[in-house]
């Protein structure tokens, strides 16, 4: 058995087509959504990610604003840039590209962002609203992951879902999102303290691998026919690798490739959050 490919590029193109129409409708009302990025330092991976985000904006018709800053910027200088974007009406939403240099306090930086302009959905206020099931920008990778499963008809209602990884960007929020009434899944959150990870994953209908450990999920850990999302990214010998071993494709019913699975949807839902806020401000 060879798994169905959960093609994130295909679904991203569908989302972009919809967003482009929505942006065109906003422009007819004189409103141009704007996405800003704040990039500190010269990390090649971060520069690549930011470049792709601005290319996405160009494709959809969203105005893009860049703030590329030196690696030795002080906390107060970075706060000043964030305060500027908070006050800039042309900036509908923005992100601070992580990771930041070690001398900067990431949590303090994220807390400085206006929660309404938090395009990543990772501000403490917005994560708190997720816990309370109140409307707020949703974290992009979990939102993209769940939407990808829905796009390809993977049943979530009543499904046993195992999430591997407890990070704030994926593991913790996706568990909250999957247990909403709209998804109604039963979620087990696994991590480095889990005693028998394989026993947990073999019982799962859906596995979300977000540990950042190359090829850690192997075929013998997967129930035949299960759906597997490969979310984790790591580098080995200069090569980008996901968490899912290639042999999983011979056992699982559906697998998201990495790259080309959840990654494109993370970017798509980043722009989605910006367009959605622009529509809200326009009263649409």
Swiss-Prot record:
Fetch the Gene3D superfamilies from UniProt: Leucine Dehydrogenase, chain A, domain 1, NAD(P)-binding Rossmann-like Domain
Which PANTHER family did the record assign?
A: C-1-TETRAHYDROFOLATE SYNTHASE, CYTOPLASMIC (PTHR48099:SF5), C-1-TETRAHYDROFOLATE SYNTHASE, CYTOPLASMIC-RELATED (PTHR48099)
**Which HAMAP family does the entry link to?**
THF_DHG_CYH (MF_01576)
Question: Could you tell me the EC number(s) of this protein?
Answer: 1.5.1.5, 3.5.4.9
Keyword RNA-binding found: no
Family (UniProt): Belongs to the tetrahydrofolate dehydrogenase/cyclohydrolase family.
The name this protein carries in UniProt is Bifunctional protein FolD
What Gene Ontology molecular function terms does this protein carry? methenyltetrahydrofolate cyclohydrolase activity; methylenetetrahydrofolate dehydrogenase (NADP+) activity
Provide the species name. Answer: Corynebacterium efficiens (strain DSM 44549 / YS-314 / AJ 12310 / JCM 11189 / NBRC 100395)
Underlying gene? folD
């Amino acid at each position: 058995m060879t798994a169905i490919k959960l093609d994130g590029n295909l679904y991203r193109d569908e989302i972009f087509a919809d967003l482009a129409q929505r942006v065109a409708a906003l422009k007819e009302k004189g409103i141009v959504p704007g996405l800003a990025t704040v990039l500190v330092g010269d990390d090649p991976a971060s520069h690549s990610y930011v470049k792709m985000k601005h290319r996405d904006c160009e494709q959809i018709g969203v105005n893009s604003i860049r703030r590329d800053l030196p690696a030795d910027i002080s906390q107060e200088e970075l706060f000043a840039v964030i305060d500027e974007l908070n006050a800039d009406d042309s900036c509908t939403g923005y992100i601070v590209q992580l990771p930041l240099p070690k001398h900067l306090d990431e949590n303090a930086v994220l807390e400085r962002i206006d929660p309404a302009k938090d395009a990543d959905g990772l501000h403490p206020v917005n994560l708190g609203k997720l816990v309370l099931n109140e409307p707020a920008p949703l974290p992009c990778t979990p939102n993209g992951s769940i939407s990808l499963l829905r796009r390809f008809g993977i049943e979530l209602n009543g499904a046993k879902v195992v999430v591997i990884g407890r990070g704030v960007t994926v593991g913790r929020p996706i568990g909250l999102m999957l247990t909403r009434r709209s998804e109604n899944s039963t979620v087990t959150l696994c991590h480095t303290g889990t005693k028998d990870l394989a026993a947990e994953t073999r019982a799962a209908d859906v596995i979300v691998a977000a540990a950042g450990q190359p090829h850690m999920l192997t075929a013998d850990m997967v129930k035949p026919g299960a759906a597997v999302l490969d979310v984790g990214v790591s580098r080995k010998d200069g090569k980008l690798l996901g968490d899912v071993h290639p042999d999983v494709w011979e056992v699982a019913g559906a697998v998201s490739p990495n790259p080309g699975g959840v990654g494109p949807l993370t970017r798509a839902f980043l722009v989605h959050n910006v367009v959605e806020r622009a529509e809200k401000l326009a009263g649409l």
